[in-house]
């Protein structure tokens, strides 16, 4: 499949998606999000892909949603079409996904990064939810995911003032897992994805599911859910291989089944 707004490739067992609207600082529009949905579904369906990296350009991961596209909307149109509701598909990707963020990740761009499983940021990265300056609020999960990531006080600060925070503050706040030099960003993200993809795919996908459900369940429910997933992995060939390799002191050769 050819894409108008994305660059899509595979490197070994890693799927790499690069946002490619340089003239608009990778602003998110309907075409880009439809193409991103298609690319993610293709990678999810490809058994040869074990992890995904989502990247932007050096200047901007994504500078926000495309304001020109949404400017003329009214409430009825937006409500009936569930505007932005369909963009949640990114968070529903089943395989582990890493956001490699350089430059601006603002508004919808920050929300898109937060839909990934974790964020690796360049030292140049800038995060923020500046929707308040446009007379609106975050609409792609910013008020929800940001609060879960950094806590109420920091989320209120960022959302109510519209200010940006740099990569160092984002890492201290828990939004970002690692900060690296700009020239090492893609290498670091691909390296992490390659490591994840080298493990059992069923185990990696269940680990992702368990962590994500922890945000929705009570502790007792979450513990039961985790335990059932753990137990279910004993039905896989990879569990047998992983434990046999550990006992034999050799490297496991997972078959992803």
UniProtKB/Swiss-Prot annotation:
Gene Ontology MF terms in the entry: enoyl-CoA hydratase activity
Source species, domain of life: Bacteria
UniProt GO BP: fatty acid beta-oxidation
EC number: 4.2.1.17
Keywords assigned by UniProt, alphabetized: Fatty acid metabolism, Lipid metabolism, Lyase
Enzyme class: lyase
InterPro entries: ClpP/crotonase-like_dom_sf, Enoyl-CoA_hyd/isom_CS, Enoyl-CoA_hydra/iso, Enoyl-CoA_hydra_C
Family: Belongs to the enoyl-CoA hydratase/isomerase family.
This protein's name: Probable enoyl-CoA hydratase
């Amino acid at each position: 499949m050819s894409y108008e707004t994305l660059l899509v490739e595979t490197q070994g067992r890693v799927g790499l998606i690069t946002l490619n609207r340089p003239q608009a600082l990778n602003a998110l529009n309907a075409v880009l999000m439809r193409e991103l949905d298609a690319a993610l579904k293709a990678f999810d369906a490809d058994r040869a892909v074990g992890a995904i990296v989502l990247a932007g350009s050096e200047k901007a991961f994504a500078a926000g949603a495309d304001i020109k596209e949404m400017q003329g909307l009214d409430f009825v149109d937006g409500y009936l079409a569930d505007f932005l509701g369909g963009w949640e598909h990114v968070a529903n990707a089943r395989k582990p996904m890493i956001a490699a963020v350089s430059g601006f990740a603002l508004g919808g761009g920050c929300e898109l990064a937060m839909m990934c499983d974790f964020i690796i940021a360049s030292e140049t990265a800038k995060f923020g939810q500046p929707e308040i300056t446009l007379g609106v609020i975050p609409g792609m999960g910013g008020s929800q995911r940001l609060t879960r990531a950094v806590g109420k006080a920091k989320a209120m600060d960022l959302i109510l003032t519209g200010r940006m925070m740099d990569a160092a503050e984002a890492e201290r706040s828990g939004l970002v897992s690692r900060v690296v030099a700009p020239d090492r960003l893609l290498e670091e993200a691909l390296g992490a994805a390659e490591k994840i993809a080298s493990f059992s795919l069923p185990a990696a996908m269940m680990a992702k599911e368990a962590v994500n459900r922890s945000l929705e369940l009570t502790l007792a429910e979450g513990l039961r859910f985790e335990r059932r997933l753990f137990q279910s992995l004993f039905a896989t060939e990879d569990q047998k291989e992983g434990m046999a390799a550990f006992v034999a002191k050799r490297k496991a050769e997972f078959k992803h089944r």
